[in-house]
């Protein structure tokens, strides 16, 4: 088994790791000082989701070009950014609770359809990613490719719909109200 350097000289993974380690105490500090985390954290989460989606796409492009080391680093970076998202999301829910879509009508139906598929698939992503990365790290590339064909589109869908849910809940709904 090749010992892979998860962070190496790849700065994005280090940035994600720093966000995870330093960001959570900063959120707690801001909350203690009365900052409106309900307004800040959803935008942070949408940014993390978008970043993860871009990294996933670039990682897919890298492997299609047979740039294996670049692919590995991009996918590990996407994993770190997604882990940051999960921690910030759970922190936001713990601090501010869940948010309901404030408008009735067709937009709520679309929102709930997107949200339900996003939520169901998001629950599978950590497990799919863990298995996919484990197989790559242990050089079981035939099995890695088989599960990656499922992991990538699901993970990309969850990243994109995460941004869409944010836009619908925090920007579209208030505009329609």
Task: Mark where each language-model region is.
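Alpha-helical membrane insertion/targeting regions
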Residues: 1-177
